[in-house]
């Protein structure tokens, strides 16, 4: 951990945003942020103290009464303006993502696009939070419902999508009338301040959106503070469990999205060219650092060899290099530590007896500066191998061969994670049965990464999601609002005198 004095000078300092402005932290701890393609330090980020987080919560709490009473059309107009400003600065934001995360520019731009779609969805908030009304439910009695904000909300987001995942959260939270505190990943924090600046430019009042940088100190302060009413989290399963158990024990509404091991099933009748293209893009795009990356391939019957015949040349042709070169298809991993962790899984897969078909440790790119690994492919893995069971979060595909379609469903359903899955087939009956019987939250049919669009909702099953509500879409609206039902009777309905029973027909 760097000293505070080092944060001033040669590298950019990334701090907190509270009550409409960048504020000085009371912390003496800073973390280094690296350009993952070169290994050079490009910024330092403050590790917020409990006092820093307390100030952000206080600002959000103070801003809540006025913002929650702001007409919904005015809140929607802030979202419309935010959309316009993000589109204006899109290239700059993509470069921020690529420098700190490493993904190639066109992938970074795609991340921005998917986040923008949630902003567009939030622009329709006047319609999305409409309640229901029934007149004359009893004599002179009407009943109606309304959706009101939860209060101060917080989002804790991962390194792999520094732009998109925060946009899964704060546009809907703010549009619903809540105030919001964002705790981004300390590995690539710069986008968080960009969102704060653009929201302020869009007309959002001070205190409605706040940013606290940091590590577990900031996270635990958020989870334990009674002024926060709801917490959204995306990250690994162990941390998701901690977030869910701690925050819910403190009376908060929680959606905590955890880990994944996403399978792609290849049936014998599949178009092998398309299946191979899908595996290269979904397995190695963003260096496999996606919660919806395909990391396990399940080949059914005799499909393995025809698939490999198409897949291996495509892996060999994959262009790996710096993300700032838009001709590249895969960039580096986020940090040296994470690269080494992924490399250790390749070592482990060999030790466990899986057949190493493509070894990313030997790729020419690994001789370059930065945190690079080449694409890796294991074949003949089994369900008892850790390289299959665990989330590697890197450019490693693991192939399991099964005899039948039913075996493929069984293998996937037996896995502890249930985030996303896909099947490639020309058989409509098989596709329909797969979609109905697979125990996974998001399913693709001839679509390798079935991330729902903004007007649906994103969420897995089993140990991939903790909490009852998925993220964004109508599930997001429900998460960031509380339902209130009003039963009313006006004086003309009570002229008969005292009533000692519930009003009804």
Q: Where is each model-derived feature located?
A:
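ALDH superfamily catalytic-core signature
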Residues: 238-382, 411, 445, 492-496, ...
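Conserved C-terminal structural/oligomerization subdomain of aldehyde/semialdehyde dehydrogenase
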Residues: 38-44, 204, 228, 265, ...
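Rossmann-like NAD(P) dinucleotide-binding subdomain of oxidoreductase/dehydrogenase enzymes
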Residues: 131-274, 327, 402, 467
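Structural signal for hydrophobic packing residues in well-ordered secondary-structure cores
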Residues: 64, 68, 83-86, 90, ...
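Residue-level signal for inorganic ion chemistry
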Residues: 39, 75, 97, 119, ...
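Short, solvent-exposed loop/turn elements at beta->coil junctions and helix N-caps
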Residues: 81, 140-142, 360-366
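Glycine-rich loop-to-alpha-helix module at the N-terminal edge of alpha/beta enzyme cores
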Residues: 40-129, 140
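Hydrophobic face of amphipathic alpha-helices that form TPR/SEL1-like repeat modules
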Residues: 1-37
